[in-house]
């Protein structure tokens, strides 16, 4: 697959720039890498947690918000795992550019959006479910009627991508590493088709 042919206005495709290898880059020096990529069990948990939360919101059961509750949705797809999106997410995660979005991650099939999470603990690696819940919790600042604006995007953008009604597939890359005695779990999820278009409703209200 020639990713150099996939064009984004924002820049060069991640796989074109860094190649197909998911081996941690020399940029990861100083981090003791314990594992690269989600396990099969974690992949299942990622999809399950996304769909559990998407269904909760779709059914109108999410009471948090500014104001809450969030309206029910009529177009909330169930997400499935996409290996290609996961591979591209992993190539980027393995560059160790922590909490930075890559410039181009599209596939031939989709424009692709991205969520990034990072958490650490002194005694265990935080679970993927914990990381995804960080995104979910942004709902507390979200007003459905205002939608996504330049002003609120930094506070709610992970939540809005997570429950973007039209998104169909998710694929994630991850690293677990030790740095300064902290056990850190770093997760990047890529979403196709992408969400978070300014001025569009995040899902259709029921």
Curated annotation (Swiss-Prot):
PROSITE patterns: CRISP_1, CRISP_2. GO terms for cellular component: extracellular region. The keyword Secreted applies. Pfam families: CAP. It is found in: Secreted. Expressed by the venom gland. SUPFAM superfamilies: PR-1-like (SSF55797). Disulfide bonds join 4-16, 8-104, 28-96, 172-189. Residues 48-191 form the SCP domain. Belongs to the CRISP family. Venom allergen 5-like subfamily. PANTHER family: CYSTEINE-RICH SECRETORY PROTEIN-RELATED (PTHR10334). This is Venom allergen 5.
């Amino acid at each position: 697959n020639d990713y150099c042919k996939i064009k984004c206005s924002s820049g060069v495709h991640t796989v074109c720039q860094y190649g197909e290898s998911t081996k941690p880059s020399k940029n990861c020096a100083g981090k003791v890498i314990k594992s690269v990529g989600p396990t099969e069990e974690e992949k299942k948990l990622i999809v399950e947690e996304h769909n559990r939360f998407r269904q909760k919101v779709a059914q109108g059961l999410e009471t948090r918000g500014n104001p809450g509750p969030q309206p029910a949705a009529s177009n909330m797809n169930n997400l499935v795992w996409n290996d290609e999106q996961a591979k591209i997410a992993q190539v980027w995660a393995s560059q160790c550019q922590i909490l930075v979005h890559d410039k181009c991650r599209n596939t031939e099939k989709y424009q692709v959006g991205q969520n990034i999470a990072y958490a650490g603990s002194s005694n265990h690696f935080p679970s993927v479910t914990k990381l995804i819940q960080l995104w979910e919790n942004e709902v507390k600042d979200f007003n459905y009627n205002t939608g996504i604006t330049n002003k609120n995007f930094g506070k709610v953008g992970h939540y809005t991508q997570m429950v973007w009604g039209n998104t169909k597939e998710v694929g994630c890359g991850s690293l677990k590493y030790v740095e300064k005695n902290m056990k850190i779990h770093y997760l990047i999820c890529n979403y196709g088709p992408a969400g978070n278009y300014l001025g569009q409703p995040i899902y259709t209200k029921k």
